[in-house]
């Protein structure tokens, strides 16, 4: 996010979609909420491999780090596809949409089951649907 903010102009907004993995370091979650809302024009909190945890619980832990002055700079959408869709819909032509977290992974792990989910595929699919 720092690298993006160093090169973007003041007219380009940064819209960040991110989440935290389940069954992992709980202490990092509030810090990620704080940083994402500080450094983004809009942060959209979503799921990222909730594993055996309730996605809403993970999101609440992330939200706990959002500072009061940044409450208007985020929203939470548990469905990752819908979160990406919201980011694309909100974006204007010069904006930057950062979908963070999954990288090369092509699945969402939920309750021990890996469900196919690829951020890149989803972005391309949604962009095609929304530009018709």
What are these regions (language model features)?
Residues 1-132:
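ATP-dependent carboxylate-amine ligase
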């Amino acid at each position: 996010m720092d690298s993006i903010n160093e090169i973007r102009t003041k007219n380009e907004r940064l819209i960040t979609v991110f989440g935290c993995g389940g069954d992992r370091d709980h202490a990092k979650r509030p810090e990620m909420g704080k940083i994402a809302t500080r450094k983004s024009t809009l942060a959209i909190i979503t799921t990222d491999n909730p594993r055996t945890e309730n996605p809403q619980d993970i999101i609440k832990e992330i939200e706990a780090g959002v500072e009061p002055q940044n409450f208007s700079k985020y929203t939470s959408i548990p469905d990752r596809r819908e979160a990406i869709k919201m980011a694309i819909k909100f974006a204007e032509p010069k904006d930057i949409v950062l979908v963070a977290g999954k990288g090369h992974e092509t699945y969402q792990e939920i309750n021990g089951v890996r469900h196919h989910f690829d951020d890149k595929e989803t972005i391309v699919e949604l962009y095609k649907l929304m530009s018709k």
